[in-house]
């Protein structure tokens, strides 16, 4: 059984018919392809739940209440004054990296292109901006409960994580007079107001029913599980490691009066030969860049064809040919689990491969054959190099019998991505065709 189908079956037994799959992201800068694994893992489990007849939603929580943590290289030093302020409440950068007060918010600016990229791979989540959940008062009950049980939560975090919290630690971070959470000390609580003093010597009160502060991450995550009724949220191995935020979130969620999702951990995507993706290290391939090179169904197959607990080597070089070959072979000769000649191991593999093909399609329920566009990846790579115009490619495909009439949108999109790949640094040199433009008289 495919891992997504197995998870859907398990969720049905544990939580019943109603399921909420979730993933999320902090819109602090450019996203990398590593984020795609969490998102597609959750989305594929959601699809598997629907295929199993369950009532399922897929939500995507944007951590827009998270603060700007530092001035990133693409930002001007003017952003120094916004450190500690929620991303939803600070301006997006202009082309020079300066704050643009007339544009989008910082969170919206970086989120938009990412959602466009998700749409290209068939992911259409229900987007929830976390600052709106705070401003609507949905967090208020959880915040009050966390404050009233602060010592119990402190004990959970210190015992499970093995780290000692500061003596002034408080399970709520109010915004100070300058809109930043940094340098703010809580002085008291009278529901619904948290009283504070900030680094500027000013005093004030934050209303927990509004977006005037937020829960620390480990408590925020546990609280949202209950607020949104989340039953499934895959976590990266950093959060899912022993003592990590998932382990502390489970008992905190129960303490706050809700049932947490089962623990589900995925391995990271690594750039082949370069280690895990990391925004801070610069070791990234953006999802938009990847989609300009890789057919979306093959990008989905990269995730669908690997168990969640196995790391993935993301290679936009020669290995892309191999991945495309594997995908095309399975589509052209689909596995048949009902074949009586199969061994038990072969039948399990056939069921798993069938699930991977089903979940790799951009549109749920579509025929995988339609994604091939009538021509193999390798053949198109050859034609795209020796034919300078798209019309010449189409004519060649008509002559070879691969195409009759006009090319469909799938084939046109494939050729566009192929030309992008050939023109990029990622295309393997041993696959590059050098066309001699002049006859050598010697």
Model-predicted segments: where are they?
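Arginine/glycine-rich "motif VI" loop of SF2 helicases in the C-terminal RecA-like domain
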Residues: 51, 256-260, 320, 338
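An acidic- and aromatic-residue-enriched active-site/binding cleft used to recognize and process polar
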Residues: 23-27, 61-65, 130-132, 201, ...
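N-terminal Rossmann-like or analogous alpha/beta NTP/dinucleotide-binding catalytic cores
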Residues: 1-154, 249-250, 256
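Catalytic adenosine-cofactor/nucleotide-binding cores of aminoacyl-tRNA synthetases and other
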Residues: 241, 246, 267-433
């Amino acid at each position: 059984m495919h891992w997504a189908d197995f998870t859907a079956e398990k969720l049905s037994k544990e939580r019943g018919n109603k399921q909420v799959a979730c993933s999320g992201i902090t819109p602090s800068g450019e996203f990398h392809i590593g984020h795609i694994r969490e998102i597609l893992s959750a989305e594929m489990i959601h699809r598997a739940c629907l295929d199993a007849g369950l009532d399922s939603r897929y939500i995507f929580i944007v951590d827009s209440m998270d603060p700007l943590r530092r001035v990133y290289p693409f930002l001007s030093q003017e952003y120094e004054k916004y450190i500690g302020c929620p991303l939803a409440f600070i301006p997006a950068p202009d082309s020079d990296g300066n704050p643009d007060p007339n544009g989008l918010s910082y969170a919206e600016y970086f989120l938009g292109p990412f959602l466009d990229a998700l749409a290209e791979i068939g992911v259409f989540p229900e987007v929830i901006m976390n600052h709106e959940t705070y401003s609507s008062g949905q967090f208020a009950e959880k915040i009050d409960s966390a404050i009233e049980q602060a010592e119990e939560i402190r004990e959970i975090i210190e015992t499970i994580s093995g780290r000692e919290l500061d003596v002034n630690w408080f399970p709520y971070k109010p915004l100070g007079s300058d809109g930043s959470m940094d340098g703010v000390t809580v002085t008291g609580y009278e529901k619904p107001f948290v009283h504070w003093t900030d680094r500027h010597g000013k005093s004030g009160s934050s209303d927990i029913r509004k977006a005037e502060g937020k829960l620390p991450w480990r408590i925020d995550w546990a609280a949202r599980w209950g607020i949104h009724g989340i039953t499934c949220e895959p976590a990266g191995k950093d959060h899912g490691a022993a003592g990590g935020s998932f382990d502390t979130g489970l008992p905190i969620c129960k303490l706050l009066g809700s049932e947490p999702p089962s623990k589900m951990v995925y391995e990271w995507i690594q750039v082949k030969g370069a280690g895990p993706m990391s925004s801070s290290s610069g070791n990234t391939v953006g999802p938009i860049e990847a989609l300009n090179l890789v057919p979306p169904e093959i990008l989905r197959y990269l995730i669908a064809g690997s168990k969640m607990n196995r790391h993935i080597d993301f290679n936009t070089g020669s290995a892309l040919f191999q991945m495309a070959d594997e995908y095309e072979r399975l589509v052209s000769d689909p596995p048949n689990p009902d074949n009586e000649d199969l061994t038990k191991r072969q039948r399990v593999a056939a069921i798993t491969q069938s699930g991977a093909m089903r979940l790799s399609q951009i549109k749920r329920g579509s025929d995988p054959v339609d994604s091939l566009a009538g021509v193999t990846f390798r053949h198109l790579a050859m034609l795209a190099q020796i034919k300078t115009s798209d019309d010449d490619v189409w004519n060649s495909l008509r002559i070879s019998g691969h195409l009759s009439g006009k090319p469909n949108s799938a084939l046109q999109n494939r050729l566009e991505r192929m030309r992008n790949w050939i023109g990029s640094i990622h295309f393997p040199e041993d696959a590059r065709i050098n066309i001699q433009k002049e006859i050598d008289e010697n």
